[in-house]
């Protein structure tokens, strides 16, 4: 099989915990591009937070952002696909989190809207050295009810994130998608949003068959994408659930797993 499209998760797959990219991964992505493979990013990050990594990797393709809620071209920023959250249920979810004293961020037009400044904001922004515009709101539920959000993200201790997501799933799971993107982060998006759905949309737009698509990830929010791709790969550091549904588990991020996969599974296959 000649693979034509490679979709890469960022954090834990391409980007290390210190927000660096292994030179071996950078070189392998360049080699894939030189071989004619379209390489893109599929991330929970907003477009503004994904673009610096796309630039560093010389990726000038549509990027899948916000867990698949948005497909936006790099570097122009042109939006090719977008799904926003219904106001009433988004306000309900925000209110639930605030009542439980959990820090929540609403993403509206690439601006982070918050109800109060707390240490969790600094923790979250530490993953975004490029910076982000933050807006303090007196009534965050009212703001999201009136202005459609692309995503909600909450920050909590690892032992709190799981139960909180379960509670949100019971309350709003028939109207919003809940997912875990990090041990400290839970996220909500519009019903139907997933990296897998966005990747299918992008492949269709590009005229690439499902069988020619490769996806690599490590977390819960990569499940649909890895399951949908013609070749779905789980990082060695991936959660067990992802390894269970992937076609293959590759080396961990510490061992430049993406570089290994490109060399042994994509370029060798393309050369055949």
Regions found by a protein language model. Give the residues of each.
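Mg2+-dependent phosphoryl-transfer enzymes with acidic/Ser/Thr/Gly-rich catalytic loops
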Residues: 1-5, 22, 34, 187-272
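Asp-based phosphoryl-transfer active-site loop
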Residues: 2-17
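Active-site phosphate-binding/coordination module
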Residues: 20-125
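Hydrophobic packing residues within well-ordered alpha-helices of enzyme cores
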Residues: 25, 50-54, 164, 168, ...
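Short, structured coil segments at secondary-structure junctions
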Residues: 57-59, 66-67, 75, 171-174, ...
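Conserved acidic, metal-coordinating active-site core of Asp-based
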Residues: 96, 100-216, 220, 225, ...
